[in-house]
């Protein structure tokens, strides 16, 4: 697999997840696996949060937002990535937003649907989930990273274009850059290399913000994307 990343991006990603206190072995227990839901103009979305065991009083942990690919949900994505095991060992929280099958029959994030605004509506719901987790859990808001697979990777990149100041790092695994599609048909074309880049809606604050480092992971024999 080809990994397209600079050394500085990799170092920045590791730094954003590094605990502020000395790392210690996690106490016995598997941690907490908690459900949640947010509602907004684009409807409602469920999510899951993993919290490692033994969080001390006043301790703040980094947060990693994980966006699944098509046909997945929080449970299957957590199981396939084993991110909760890593979070327990390295001591950080994990947020898994879930796409609703009523919003997309294949369970894909609608990152491409910028023409009708569905992409931006879903991005807003994911940010609501991030904000809710920050309120209810001991999150270090200065150390939040986001990662996604396939459609989740594209949505992660879209989210960062709208809120670059909220994230310390972004990881795209087998995704398509946002702005290369505006409908289901053009998204399918973009997956096979037929891409016409168009400007994305953003805000002056986003344009002036410091952009987080990007790590791109993509197989050179990928026949899907």
Regions found by a protein language model. Name each.
Residues 1-63, 75-81, 89, 93, ...:
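A domain-start/cap signature at the N-terminus of enzymes
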Residues 66-69, 96:
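Structural cue for short, hydrophobic secondary-structure segments
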Residues 71-73:
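Serine-hydrolase catalytic-loop signature spanning alpha/beta hydrolases and amidase-signature enzymes
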Residues 98-121:
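Cap/lid segment of the alpha/beta-hydrolase catalytic domain
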Residues 208-214:
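Short, proline-enriched alpha-helix->beta-strand connector loops that line the catalytic pocket
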Residues 216-218, 222:
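Short beta-strand/loop motif that positions the catalytic acidic residue
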């Amino acid at each position: 697999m080809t990994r397209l990343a600079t050394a500085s991006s990799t170092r920045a990603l590791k730094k954003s997840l590094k605990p502020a206190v000395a790392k210690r072995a996690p106490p016995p227990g598997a941690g907490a696996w908690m459900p949640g839901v947010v509602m907004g103009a684009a409807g409602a979305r469920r999510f899951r949060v993993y919290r490692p065991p033994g969080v001390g009083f006043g301790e703040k942990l980094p947060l990693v937002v994980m966006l699944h690919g098509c046909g997945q949900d929080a449970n299957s994505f957590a199981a396939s990535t084993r991110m909760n095991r890593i979070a327990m060992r390295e001591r950080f929280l994990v947020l898994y937003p879930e796409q609703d099958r009523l919003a997309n029959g294949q369970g894909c994030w609608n990152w491409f649907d910028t023409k009708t605004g569905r992409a931006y509506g879903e991005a807003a719901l994911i940010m609501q989930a991030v904000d809710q987790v920050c309120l209810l859990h001991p999150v270090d808001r200065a150390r939040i990273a986001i990662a996604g697979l396939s459609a989740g990777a594209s949505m992660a990149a879209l989210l960062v274009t709208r809120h670059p100041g909220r994230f310390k790092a972004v990881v795209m695994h087998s995704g398509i850059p946002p702005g290369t599609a505006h409908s289901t048909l053009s998204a399918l074309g973009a997956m096979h290399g037929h891409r016409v880049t168009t400007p994305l809606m953003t805000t002056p604050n986003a344009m002036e913000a410091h952009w987080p480092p990007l790590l791109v992971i993509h197989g050179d024999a990928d026949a899907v994307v």
